[in-house]
Every structure is written in C-alpha cells, then in structure tokens.
Amino acid sequence: SELIHSLLPVFMVSVLGASMLTVGIIEGVAEATASIMKVFSGALSDYLGRRKFLMILGYALAAFTKPVFPLAHSVAWVFAARFVDRVGKGIRGAPRDALVADITPPQLRGAAYGLRQALDSAGALLGPLLAVVFMLAFANDIRAVMWVAVVPAFIAVALLMIYVREPERDSD
C-alpha cells in the first residue's frame, strides 16, 4: 500500500489532472473511512469470533483495489479504489490485533505487538523508498510502478489464508 500511496498525489495531479483540493478531499475521506470502520470491526470481530475471516476480508479488499490504481483514467476511479482500500484497512486492524492477543502467551504479548508494529513501520519506510527505486528503474512510468505493488498485496492474502490459524474458542 505504501508504495502506491506515496505516489498517488503526484499521479492524481500530474496524470489525471486533479486539483490539490481534490487530492485532499480524497485522502481525507479515505482516512476517515478507515477510522470509522475500525470502530465497528473490533465489535464485529468479538461478536463473530472469526478474526481470520475479517482479516482476510480486509486484506483482500485492499489487494483487489491495487490494480485499479494503474488502470485509473479518472479521479473517480482513484476515489473508489481508495475508499474500498480504506474500508479494508478498517476491517482488518482490530481483528488482526485481537488475533495477535489470542495466539500469543500473555508474557509475550508486548513483544508480539512490538514486532507487529515494527513490521508495519518497516513497510511504511520501505514502500516510499521502493517507489523511488522503481520510478528510477521504470523511467518515471508511474503506472508500471503501481503494477509492482499488486504482487505483494495478493501474496499477503495468500499467506494469511494458508498459514494463519485461528485458535479454538471457548464455548462459554
């Protein structure tokens, strides 16, 4: 996500002809959407007790938006993709954190959350750096660089589906 998101304002303004105000509105709505969804996803995760399902749903929604960005020929496409992407982010966050707590022994939870946050921060750092590297490698072809981000998004969903196991829940 960070690879695409770091390029998105430039893409919207220089390729799609959006104004800076439009970029601000799109980003504001997108981030507000993620925040609102987080409120409901935690309660839904606890109610359903199916954290893995909600995580996969959230990451899959985000993954399926990735090809929309390089295919976009209007700001409306980008807006729709950013909205769905942030719905996915909002859905996956609380269940992901709850699953970390569910599968981690109490004495290791701090370390587990620290590792999760460290990996998230690493992605936030590496995404924009890789965007620069790929922009240089692809001679500033921003759409080609966006296509690169599609691959890890779908790999992440596949890894979740294959390797993450939901713990047995008590039937209390």
Please report, for each region that a protein language model flagged, where it lies by residue.
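Helix-loop boundary and gating motifs at the non-cytosolic
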Residues: 1-35
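Transmembrane alpha-helix termini and helix-breaking/packing motifs in multi-pass membrane transporters
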Residues: 10-15, 126-146
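Residue-level signature of mid-helix packing/kink "hotspots" within the transmembrane helices
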Residues: 31-39, 124-125
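Helix-to-loop junctions at the C-terminal end of transmembrane segments
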Residues: 37-50, 135
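Structural signature of the two symmetry-related core transmembrane helices
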Residues: 53-68, 150
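Helix-loop junctions at membrane interfaces in 12-TM secondary transporters
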Residues: 68-82
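Cytoplasmic helix-loop-helix junction between adjacent transmembrane helices
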Residues: 81-122
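Symmetry-related core transmembrane helices of the 12-TM Major Facilitator Superfamily/SLC fold
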Residues: 143-161
